[in-house]
């Protein structure tokens, strides 16, 4: 039997597992079992870092990235409008956010 993990009570450095897939490119994995779920990717550039798909599965992905992965300013890139890819964009409202025009229109239309 697997123990349930309450991610909200974990210290920020234990809320995710990060995997370096190539230099300056990370995949963040949260505690989601038996689920085909989107995972944020972080690509670190010379001046900024991009969070690709903030998702809806993680608690405070921005805080984690800023404290554990990089101290560079962040931008977000949304691949498409589905909430499981964009819900946590609100954490980065003061960051530059990139998405297609269609994605922006779909987010506006489907905003709850």
Predicted region positions:
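Conserved beta-strand hairpin/beta-sheet module of binuclear metal-dependent hydrolase folds
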Residues: 14-67
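Active-site HxH/HxHxD metal-binding segment of metal-dependent hydrolases
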Residues: 61-112
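Metallo-beta-lactamase
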Residues: 2-23, 94-112
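Short amphipathic alpha-helical surface micro-motifs
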Residues: 8-11, 24, 33, 77-81
């Amino acid at each position: 039997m697997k123990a349930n993990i309450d991610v909200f009570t974990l210290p920020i450095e234990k809320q995710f597992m990060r995997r370096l897939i190539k230099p300056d490119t990370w995949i963040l994995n949260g505690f989601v079992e038996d689920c085909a779920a989107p995972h944020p990717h972080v690509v670190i550039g010379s001046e900024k870092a991009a969070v690709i798909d903030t998702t809806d599965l993680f608690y405070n992905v921005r805080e984690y990235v800023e404290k554990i992965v990089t101290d560079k300013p962040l931008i977000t890139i949304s691949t498409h409008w589905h909430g499981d890819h964009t819900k946590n964009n609100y954490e980065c409202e003061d960051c530059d956010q990139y998405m297609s025009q269609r994605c922006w229109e779909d987010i506006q239309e489907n905003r709850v």
